[in-house]
Amino acid sequence: MLEFLSQQKPKILIIGDFMVDNYTWCDCSRISPEAPVLVAKTLKEDKRLGGAANVYANLKNLGADVFALGVVGDDESGKFLQENLKGEFLIQKGRKTPFKNRIMAHNQQVLRLDEEDTSAILLENELIALFDEKIKDFKAVVLSDYAKGVLTPKVCKAVIEKAKALNIPVLVDPKGSDFSKYSGATLLTPNKKEALEALKFENLEGKNLEKGIKKLKEDFALRYSIITLSEAGIALFDENLKIAPAKALEVYDVTGAGDSVIAVLAFCLANEIEIFKACELANEAAAVVVSKIGSVSVSFDEIKSFKHVDFEKKIKSKEELLALLKQNDKKIVFTNGCFDIVHFGHIKYLEKAKRLGDVLVVGLNSDASVKSLKGESRPVNSEFQRACMLAAFYFVDFVVVFDEDTPLELISFLKPDILVKGADYKDKIVVGADIVSKVELIDFEEGFSTSKIIEKIKDKK
C-alpha cells in the first residue's frame, strides 16, 4: 500500500484556521534578580506552518497536490502564510492572523505566547463563493478547525453540502463542544477530550467507547466516526467498532500529531483506500511526529523507516534510559528476568505488564548474572540476542541489562512507578517493592517455562 500511495498525487483542498507556529529557542540557566522567574536568553527562532497550514505541509510532504483556502489578516503572519502556501487567501483588514510563539529551553516548552483574533470572519460569503469556484477539481476536502473564526456554521454547512453533492469526501478535524455544524461530513477526527465534551459523557472506557463513537456517527450523519485515543490508538466506527493500536516508541512532543492523522486519512480517502487501513497508516504517521519536537510534517519515506524500525535503539544503558524517562511525565512499568528462551508465557506476561502503564522497561539479567543464578550451562542465548528479541516486541519500550543477581540497584536508580512480578511471588519478598509506588503480580500462562523447553530438547536428543 505504501508503494502505491507514494506514487499518487491527489488534489486536496484545505479550508480552516491557518496559523504560524514560532519556536524561540532559549538558554534558561539563570534566575532573575528582579523576581523568582527564569531568565530566557534567545538563541534562535524558527518559524513554522501551524494549524491548517501544518495539515497542508503534511499533505504536501506525502505527495499531494494541495490547495489552501482561508482568511488572514493584513499582518506579517498573513504574509508568511501567503508566501509559503499554494492557494488563495482573503485579506480581512485589521484581523490578527493566529501566531503562537513557543518559548523552548533544553527541548522543553516553557511558555507559549498567543496573538490571535477568534471572532467570526467577516468574509463568509466571499469564502464560500471561492470554494464553489474551486471545488470541482479536487478529490478530497479537509476542514481544519482551531476555533479561530474561519469555519463558521455557515461556511461549514455550505462546504459540506456542495462537496457531498459532488461525491467528494469531507474530513473534519473539529473544535469545540458543538459538532452540529459538521453534520453530513464524511468523518470527524476528535480526540478523546473533544469527543467527551461533544457527547457530554463522563468517560469513554469500556462499552462507553462504542456507545459514544456510534452516537457521534448517528447524531451528525457521518459516513465514519473516528476518535483518536492518544497512546491507545484510533477508534473507528463504520458498521462496528474497530481499534487501530498506537505505534509510538518514544514520545517527545504531541504537537501536530492530529494534523498528521487527518492528512494521512485525507490522502488515503482521496485514493479510495479502505478506511481501517487508512487509520492504521495514520497511527504510524502520528508515531513519527510525536518522536520529534514541534509542529512537523511526515512523509511516506519516514513512515516506511518507522515500519522497519531499528529495534536495537530500544536497548539502553541505565544512564541513557533515566535521561529519556525524565523527559516525559509517563507512568513507568518495570519488570525483569533472564528471558533466556523467549516463549509464549513470556509474551503474554509482558503484554499484560505493558497495559499497566505508559512505558514498559524490561530489566534483563546479563550473561554473568544468568550464569550465577542458573549455572554454568546457561544462558542458552547471549545477553545481546536476548535483549534484541525482547526489543522486537511492540509492547516493550526499553530493555536495560544489569549485572547483579537482583534488580535492586537498577530499580533504585530508575525509580519506576509500578513493579511487575509473576503471581508466584505472592508469598515472597519482592525486591524493590519499598522503592516503587505499586507492585503488581501477574499470572503466568500455565505449562510454559524455559527449563521445560530445554528439557524437552534434551529428551529428543
UniProtKB/Swiss-Prot annotation:
<keyword id="KW-0418">Kinase</keyword>
<comment type="function">
    <text>Catalyzes the ADP transfer from ATP to D-glycero-beta-D-manno-heptose 1-phosphate, yielding ADP-D-glycero-beta-D-manno-heptose.</text>
</comment>
<dbReference type="InterPro" id="IPR011913">
    <property type="entry name" value="RfaE_dom_I"/>
</dbReference>
<dbReference type="Pfam" id="PF01467">
    <property type="entry name" value="CTP_transf_like"/>
</dbReference>
<dbReference type="InterPro" id="IPR029056">
    <property type="entry name" value="Ribokinase-like"/>
</dbReference>
<keyword id="KW-0547">Nucleotide-binding</keyword>
<keyword id="KW-0548">Nucleotidyltransferase</keyword>
<dbReference type="GO" id="GO:0005524">
    <property type="term" value="F:ATP binding"/>
</dbReference>
<comment type="pathway">
    <text>Nucleotide-sugar biosynthesis; ADP-L-glycero-beta-D-manno-heptose biosynthesis; ADP-L-glycero-beta-D-manno-heptose from D-glycero-beta-D-manno-heptose 7-phosphate: step 3/4.</text>
</comment>
<dbReference type="InterPro" id="IPR011611">
    <property type="entry name" value="PfkB_dom"/>
</dbReference>
<keyword id="KW-0119">Carbohydrate metabolism</keyword>
<keyword id="KW-0067">ATP-binding</keyword>
<dbReference type="InterPro" id="IPR011914">
    <property type="entry name" value="RfaE_dom_II"/>
</dbReference>
<feature type="binding site">
    <location>
        <begin position="191"/>
        <end position="194"/>
    </location>
    <ligand>
        <name>ATP</name>
    </ligand>
</feature>
<keyword id="KW-0511">Multifunctional enzyme</keyword>
<dbReference type="InterPro" id="IPR014729">
    <property type="entry name" value="Rossmann-like_a/b/a_fold"/>
</dbReference>
<comment type="similarity">
    <text>In the C-terminal section; belongs to the cytidylyltransferase family.</text>
</comment>
<dbReference type="GO" id="GO:0005829">
    <property type="term" value="C:cytosol"/>
</dbReference>
<dbReference type="GO" id="GO:0033785">
    <property type="term" value="F:heptose 7-phosphate kinase activity"/>
</dbReference>
<feature type="region of interest" description="Cytidylyltransferase">
    <location>
        <begin position="334"/>
        <end position="461"/>
    </location>
</feature>
<dbReference type="GO" id="GO:0016773">
    <property type="term" value="F:phosphotransferase activity, alcohol group as acceptor"/>
</dbReference>
<comment type="pathway">
    <text>Nucleotide-sugar biosynthesis; ADP-L-glycero-beta-D-manno-heptose biosynthesis; ADP-L-glycero-beta-D-manno-heptose from D-glycero-beta-D-manno-heptose 7-phosphate: step 1/4.</text>
</comment>
<dbReference type="InterPro" id="IPR004821">
    <property type="entry name" value="Cyt_trans-like"/>
</dbReference>
<protein>
    <recommendedName>
        <fullName>Bifunctional protein HldE</fullName>
        <ecNumber>2.7.1.167</ecNumber>
        <ecNumber>2.7.7.70</ecNumber>
    </recommendedName>
</protein>
<keyword id="KW-0808">Transferase</keyword>
<feature type="region of interest" description="Ribokinase">
    <location>
        <begin position="1"/>
        <end position="312"/>
    </location>
</feature>
<dbReference type="GO" id="GO:0097171">
    <property type="term" value="P:ADP-L-glycero-beta-D-manno-heptose biosynthetic process"/>
</dbReference>
<dbReference type="Pfam" id="PF00294">
    <property type="entry name" value="PfkB"/>
</dbReference>
<comment type="similarity">
    <text>In the N-terminal section; belongs to the carbohydrate kinase PfkB family.</text>
</comment>
<comment type="subunit">
    <text>Homodimer.</text>
</comment>
<dbReference type="GO" id="GO:0033786">
    <property type="term" value="F:heptose-1-phosphate adenylyltransferase activity"/>
</dbReference>
<feature type="active site">
    <location>
        <position position="259"/>
    </location>
</feature>
<dbReference type="InterPro" id="IPR023030">
    <property type="entry name" value="Bifunc_HldE"/>
</dbReference>
